[in-house]
Amino acid sequence: MNMYCTLDTETVGGASNPLGFYHLGGIIHNRLGEVVGCFNYIIAEMLPYVLNDDYAKKNLPLYYEMLREGTATLIDTQAHAIEVVNSTLEFYNVGIMTAYNSGFDYCKTMCAELLEGREFIDLWLMALECICQKASYKKFCAESGRTNGKGGCKTNAESVFAYLIGNPTYCEEHTALEDSKIELEIFNACIKSHKKFTPNCHCWDFEGKFGLFPKLPLDK
């Protein structure tokens, strides 16, 4: 049976053309969401860039704590981290990669190598198809202020997970392994919905994507 890997990266250098990832985390699981392993790597070669990035360096205390407590491993380079992760994926027979906005993690970073010979699911597109069309999701976004300023609901992982747990004030940690955990919960909710979803397609490549972005209810 094919196993899955839900993965997240934290990067520096902007979303359009990032310099690379400084934190790589992921969870190995089956289609039922049963977890068999995880990884949590901090990349030494990228730390100087983190120190010069006002956004990224806010979480430096968390990374130092992870390293002190042994909950994360320091790896020298991105390339070495990809090599180690690939070996882990092969060990667990992972055939399907997932990420929230896979078009970023698997197209803008070295994680693209992890898709070689594997299928993928963009959890953003999956959530749009399985969760964000619900009237209750639109109502939640309207009442919690999770809007995009253009008459639409936010559909990022933080907003979708906040809806799933019924916590309008939930804030994503923005560290790779912790964010992978909430993305796995989104995957689980989508699978349990038994709704059709589109595999092997990044959200921004999906032809009907703009019709999927939910609008706020008129009676908000």
Q: Where are these predicted regions, by residue range?
A:
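Conserved protein kinase catalytic core
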Residues: 14-16, 128, 185
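Acidic two-metal-ion nuclease catalytic site recognized across multiple nuclease folds
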Residues: 164, 177-220
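Conserved beta-strand -> loop -> alpha-helix junction used to position metal-binding or nucleic-acid-contacting
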Residues: 116-132
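Active-site-proximal helix-loop-helix substrate-binding element of RNase H-like nuclease domains
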Residues: 51, 55-60, 64-65, 128-180
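Short, solvent-exposed loop/turn segments at secondary-structure junctions
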Residues: 102-106, 126, 176
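Ser/Thr-centric signal marking residues that sit
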Residues: 9-12, 123, 183
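Conserved non-catalytic scaffold segment of RNase H-like nuclease domains
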Residues: 2-108, 112-113, 158
